[in-house]
Amino acid sequence: QDNGGNFMAIFNLNVIEYCFHLLKTWQLTTTLDDTNATNLDYRNVGISYPRAACQAPEGILFADLARPTEPKFRRLQVLEGTDNTTVEPKSISDFLDLSSYAYDKCVAYRWGDYEIFCVQEKINEVANSYNSVMFARNVLSGAWSKLDYYVSCLETYYGSLIAGDSLSNNLNVLFSGYDDDGDVISNHYISEDSNLGTDN
């Protein structure tokens, strides 16, 4: 459609369909008797892979690659105080530099209080052929975590987050228990000095 690139995914937000393509997204509304329709386009909003968007309680979560030099993680949501046709692709990743990753097999997912994106790391400007990095954002605090998880797809099963391994035909349960299963843990967290609310 109109040089928007290949169709990738479709999601419903307040009885309106949003059709994501590679370079553009369309807002499709139809009447109840199916005699009339509108198809409004949103320039510069697009996804590179069918799994690069997902339905979330607040809207549609997606990795926007319409501007390849400025990739952003966004949430398409209804603007507060407006009708259900007025949406905004709000960036949730302004403090992240996402230009050093590839998104050919990007996965977006919402699990509990986490908005998750899995992407390909670039080494010497060459992208891995598989997802090798996970970004997880806590929606309550807004804090991002970068994890070395190799994930090709995500799904929730009885509350647990199940990940398809991007290097093998295996499934993993993520964020469960305290056992590292013999893996080397390369993730770390650095924070500022804090007295944790005490005067001492």
Task: Show where each model-derived region lies.
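Extracytoplasmic beta-rich repeat domains
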Residues: 1-8
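Surface-exposed extracellular loop regions of Gram-negative outer-membrane beta-barrel proteins
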Residues: 18-42
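Beta-sheet repeat architectures centered on beta-propellers
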Residues: 5, 15, 35, 44-200
